[in-house]
């Protein structure tokens, strides 16, 4: 029996307490043990916080697949600045996509290698296209696109 002094209502799939829905999850005990170990390692206060983050992440990732959703992210790549014309190519790409590139940070890693981190914003399909173009450039040793949400729909 639930005893709350706050407003309680029924919700499809669980009990709703002022905008929060309580529901049950069934899983194997081994999986739950692994989950509990991970949420402790990640410093979550409880399972609910971890599950909310997992659900948000799942929603955000699926929004990218729509391709028309406004998104924000980073393109991080390591490149050898001694590869012929790479600096010019990367700069040209940045100017070509200036409407989507908010900021770029450039760091010298050693005598030969640099890392750049770009903050990008736009439709998911545009961001993926820019990342693919940069990461596939000759001289780029490794690159990664990380997209997230603008937060509007969460």
From Swiss-Prot:
Pfam families: NikR_C, RHH_1
Superkingdom of the organism of origin: Bacteria
InterPro entries: Acetolactate_synth/TF_NikR_C, ACT-like_dom_sf, Arc_rbn_hlx_hlx, CopG, CopG/NikR_regulator, Ni_resp_reg_NikR, Ribbon_hlx_hlx, TF_NikR_Ni-bd_C
Biological process (GO), any one: response to nickel cation
Keyword presence, Acetylation: no
Amino acids binding Ni(2+): 95, 106, 108, 114
Record's keyword terms, sorted: DNA-binding, Metal-binding, Nickel, Transcription, Transcription regulation
Cofactor(s) of this protein: Ni(2+)
GO molecular-function terms, A-Z: DNA binding; DNA-binding transcription factor activity; nickel cation binding
Gene3D superfamilies associated with the record: ACT-like. Chain A, domain 2, Met repressor-like
Cofactor: binding details: Binds 1 nickel ion per subunit.
Signal peptide: none
Function comment: Transcriptional regulator.
Similarity comment text for this entry: Belongs to the transcriptional regulatory CopG/NikR family.
PANTHER family for this protein: NICKEL-RESPONSIVE REGULATOR (PTHR34719:SF2)
Descriptive protein name: Putative nickel-responsive regulator
Protein source organism: Caldanaerobacter subterraneus subsp. tengcongensis (strain DSM 15242 / JCM 11007 / NBRC 100824 / MB4) (Thermoanaerobacter tengcongensis)
Lineage: Bacteria, Bacillati, Bacillota, Clostridia, Thermoanaerobacterales
């Amino acid at each position: 029996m639930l005893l709350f002094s706050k407003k309680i209502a029924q919700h499809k799939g669980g009990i709703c307490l002022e905008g929060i829905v309580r529901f049950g999850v069934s899983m194997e005990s081994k999986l739950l043990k692994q989950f509990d170990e991970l949420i402790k390692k990640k410093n979550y206060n409880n399972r609910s916080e971890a599950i909310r983050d997992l659900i948000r992440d799942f929603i955000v990732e699926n929004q990218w697949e729509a391709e028309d959703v406004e998104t924000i992210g980073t393109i991080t790549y390591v490149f050898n600045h001694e590869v012929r014309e790479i600096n010019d190519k990367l700069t040209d790409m940045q100017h070509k996509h200036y409407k989507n590139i908010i900021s770029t940070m450039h760091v010298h890693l050693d005598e030969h290698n640099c890392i750049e981190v770009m903050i990008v914003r736009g439709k998911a399909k545009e961001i993926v296209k820019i990342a693919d173009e940069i990461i596939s450039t000759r001289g780029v040793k490794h690159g990664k696109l990380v997209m997230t949400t603008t937060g509007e729909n969460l």
